């Protein structure tokens, strides 16, 4: 039996459901999710392997008009995948009309000369007539290889989309071991899980200004727990106060919720310590961006 493999990028505007789709395919949380725009900041691989195929999905930051050096990094990181993949999934939401952001992405996709599958997500939110209208609108903009409507949240048609990708794979190598599900180290996943809880629990002004750095991560032989020390970075003193909360209540809640997810991922008991530090305007300083894991070598 021949083995097939390939790389697939997931592109689209912020908040269209790219990470939800990837997590559903993988059957576990690989990419963090929230209703805040620009939740995903780095390219994240989800490695889907069966006995006959390996599909390496690359979840990308939502493409937007950048206003900071961090925004520039995120957009370039997303577009750089067009040089690396065999197929692109261009994801759009069924419940929003095509906009300038979609048109900007379509122009880049046309220039890339890579097969593109249009994935219309969130079909659970619209009437079938609206869905058909949305599909027709996008079909007139570009010659898509396939158009697949799905609900990543409910799982509708997701397996069909994976089957379509599989059918179009070329014979190839197994690039990663069968038990490897992502390219990122555990430290990265831990930092993302802490950041996810900050996004869920804090006000609108906070999310874009937060980075999380895992300072240390090691097993304590006496307690048989993984001890993790993580620092939450913000840009202003007022943001630090919000994250700490009255009497430290918010920081404690962030840590408690993150610890549960980290324990599920690691399969170990975890002791998580968190601090909050202010690093003014870090999103516009390349050295700070590199220190916090946003490296230009990603693209």
Swiss-Prot record:
<dbReference type="InterPro" id="IPR030388">
    <property type="entry name" value="G_ERA_dom"/>
</dbReference>
<dbReference type="InterPro" id="IPR009019">
    <property type="entry name" value="KH_sf_prok-type"/>
</dbReference>
<feature type="region of interest" description="G5">
    <location>
        <begin position="150"/>
        <end position="152"/>
    </location>
</feature>
<dbReference type="Pfam" id="PF01926">
    <property type="entry name" value="MMR_HSR1"/>
</dbReference>
<dbReference type="Pfam" id="PF07650">
    <property type="entry name" value="KH_2"/>
</dbReference>
<dbReference type="InterPro" id="IPR005662">
    <property type="entry name" value="GTPase_Era-like"/>
</dbReference>
<comment type="function">
    <text>An essential GTPase that binds both GDP and GTP, with rapid nucleotide exchange. Plays a role in 16S rRNA processing and 30S ribosomal subunit biogenesis and possibly also in cell cycle regulation and energy metabolism. Complements an E.coli era disruption mutant. Binds 16S rRNA as well as poly(U) RNA, binding to the latter is inhibited by liposomes.</text>
</comment>
<keyword id="KW-0342">GTP-binding</keyword>
<feature type="binding site">
    <location>
        <begin position="121"/>
        <end position="124"/>
    </location>
    <ligand>
        <name>GTP</name>
    </ligand>
</feature>
<feature type="region of interest" description="G2">
    <location>
        <begin position="38"/>
        <end position="42"/>
    </location>
</feature>
<feature type="region of interest" description="G3">
    <location>
        <begin position="59"/>
        <end position="62"/>
    </location>
</feature>
<feature type="binding site">
    <location>
        <begin position="59"/>
        <end position="63"/>
    </location>
    <ligand>
        <name>GTP</name>
    </ligand>
</feature>
<keyword id="KW-0963">Cytoplasm</keyword>
<feature type="region of interest" description="G1">
    <location>
        <begin position="12"/>
        <end position="19"/>
    </location>
</feature>
<protein>
    <recommendedName>
        <fullName>GTPase Era</fullName>
    </recommendedName>
</protein>
<feature type="binding site">
    <location>
        <begin position="12"/>
        <end position="19"/>
    </location>
    <ligand>
        <name>GTP</name>
    </ligand>
</feature>
<dbReference type="InterPro" id="IPR015946">
    <property type="entry name" value="KH_dom-like_a/b"/>
</dbReference>
<dbReference type="GO" id="GO:0070181">
    <property type="term" value="F:small ribosomal subunit rRNA binding"/>
</dbReference>
<dbReference type="GO" id="GO:0000028">
    <property type="term" value="P:ribosomal small subunit assembly"/>
</dbReference>
<dbReference type="InterPro" id="IPR004044">
    <property type="entry name" value="KH_dom_type_2"/>
</dbReference>
<dbReference type="InterPro" id="IPR005225">
    <property type="entry name" value="Small_GTP-bd"/>
</dbReference>
<feature type="region of interest" description="G4">
    <location>
        <begin position="121"/>
        <end position="124"/>
    </location>
</feature>
<feature type="region of interest" description="Required to associate with cell membrane, for complmentation of E.coli disruption, increases affinity for GTP but decreases GTP hydrolysis">
    <location>
        <begin position="232"/>
        <end position="299"/>
    </location>
</feature>
<dbReference type="GO" id="GO:0003924">
    <property type="term" value="F:GTPase activity"/>
</dbReference>
<dbReference type="InterPro" id="IPR006073">
    <property type="entry name" value="GTP-bd"/>
</dbReference>
<comment type="subunit">
    <text>Monomer.</text>
</comment>
<keyword id="KW-0547">Nucleotide-binding</keyword>
<dbReference type="GO" id="GO:0043024">
    <property type="term" value="F:ribosomal small subunit binding"/>
</dbReference>
<keyword id="KW-0694">RNA-binding</keyword>
<feature type="domain" description="Era-type G">
    <location>
        <begin position="4"/>
        <end position="171"/>
    </location>
</feature>
<dbReference type="GO" id="GO:0005525">
    <property type="term" value="F:GTP binding"/>
</dbReference>
<comment type="similarity">
    <text>Belongs to the TRAFAC class TrmE-Era-EngA-EngB-Septin-like GTPase superfamily. Era GTPase family.</text>
</comment>
<feature type="domain" description="KH type-2">
    <location>
        <begin position="202"/>
        <end position="280"/>
    </location>
</feature>
<keyword id="KW-0472">Membrane</keyword>
<keyword id="KW-1003">Cell membrane</keyword>
<dbReference type="GO" id="GO:0005829">
    <property type="term" value="C:cytosol"/>
</dbReference>
<keyword id="KW-0690">Ribosome biogenesis</keyword>
<dbReference type="GO" id="GO:0005886">
    <property type="term" value="C:plasma membrane"/>
</dbReference>
<dbReference type="InterPro" id="IPR027417">
    <property type="entry name" value="P-loop_NTPase"/>
</dbReference>
<keyword id="KW-0699">rRNA-binding</keyword>
<dbReference type="GO" id="GO:0019843">
    <property type="term" value="F:rRNA binding"/>
</dbReference>
